Structures are given as structure tokens and as C-alpha cells.
């Protein structure tokens, strides 16, 4: 959702989390060259067998993280947020419940780690199940978290692109 507010002569556009299917990714290319490049990387590469780890895609601009994980229960849900990067999360196998909250609703649990571009927060979240072929885009105005999906008893393969804010 895009919200536009007018303040006299200043226009402020706030973009919030996006969830969609990968076949619709080109709709979001206009949001930035880095997002378009990350989506093109998904489209042009087989990511099903690549080893878990961190891969530079474009030096200092786009990094790809590959995760294979078995879901675990959590008693305490914490949210994460970033200041310098947009997260594109793409599901290849398994499903997760992803929590979202606007940054304004957070309580920082520890000092923000500038070096890792990571803040650990508590916030009331809304949850959506994401499945293979789906992606979520989280902007610096968004908090997000992944929790166990009780309906899915399988491992999850997820690709996360860290796209430097342009």
C-alpha cells in the first residue's frame, strides 16, 4: 500500500510491506533498480540447490542470503527492522507465518546495531502465511518476523536479498 500525505509544498510517500507472487514481481521494478535486479536474479537463476550462505550479487548494493531451516516453536516473538536495507524474502520450499508491524509501533529491545543494520524490537504484529513462489518486501519503515507455521511440518528454503537503500 502506498500512502501519500501533503504537508504544504512537501510531499511524503510512505511505502509499506508488499506481499505478492513472483510472477508479479515486475510490477515493483519501478520502486528501485536494486529491487528489479534482485527479482531478475530470482528469475534467471536456479536457487533450489545453491548452498546456504551469503552471496554478493552487486558489490555493496545487493547481497543474497540462502537459508535452509527446520521450523521451531518460539515462546517470545521479536520483530526485526533495518535502516539501510530493504529485505526481499522469497520462499522456495515450505511455508512460514510472517509477522509485520509498522516501525512506529515498536519498542526497541536493545540498542540498534548499525554495523549489522539490525534492530530487535517488540511490537504487535499482523501475520500472513507465505508459501513457495511468494515474496515479501520489507522497507526500512517495516518490522518483520518469521514464526512457526503449525500447518507446515517441513523445512523451509528461503532466499533473502538485502538491497541497499538508494
Where are these regions (language model features)?
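A short, N-terminal "cap"/entry segment at the start of jelly-roll beta-barrel domains
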Residues: 6-65, 73-81
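Conserved short histidine dyad/triad with adjacent acidic residue
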Residues: 64-82, 92, 96-106
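Short alpha-helix capping/helix-loop boundary micro-motifs
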Residues: 84, 120-125
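Short, conserved beta-strand element in jelly-roll/cupin
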Residues: 84-96, 104, 111-116, 162-163
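His/acidic/aromatic-lined binding-pocket segments of jelly-roll/cupin-type domains
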Residues: 87-90, 127-128, 135-136
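A short hydrophobic beta-strand segment most commonly corresponding to one strand
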Residues: 135-137, 153-166
Amino acid at each position: 500500500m502506498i500512502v501519500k500525505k501533503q504537508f504544504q509544498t512537501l510531499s511524503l510517500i510512505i511505502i509499506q510491506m508488499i506481499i505478492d507472487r513472483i510472477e508479479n514481481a515486475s510490477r515493483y521494478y519501478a520502486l528501485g533498480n536494486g529491487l528489479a535486479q534482485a527479482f531478475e536474479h530470482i528469475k534467471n537463476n536456479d536457487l533450489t540447490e545453491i548452498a546456504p550462505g551469503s552471496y554478493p550479487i552487486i558489490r555493496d548494493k545487493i547481497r543474497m542470503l540462502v537459508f535452509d531451516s527446520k521450523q521451531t516453536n518460539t515462546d517470545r516473538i521479536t520483530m526485526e527492522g533495518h535502516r539501510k536495507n530493504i529485505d526481499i524474502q522469497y520462499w522456495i520450499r515450505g511455508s512460514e507465518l510472517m509477522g509485520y508491524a509498522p516501525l512506529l509501533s515498536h519498542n526497541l529491545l536493545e540498542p540498534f546495531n548499525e554495523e549489522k543494520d539490525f534492530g530487535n524490537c517488540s511490537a504487535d504484529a499482523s501475520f500472513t502465511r507465505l508459501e513457495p513462489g511468494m515474496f515479501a518486501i520489507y522497507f526500512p519503515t517495516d518490522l518483520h518476523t518469521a514464526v512457526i507455521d503449525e500447518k507446515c511440518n517441513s523445512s523451509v528454503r528461503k532466499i533473502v536479498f538485502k538491497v541497499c537503500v538508494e
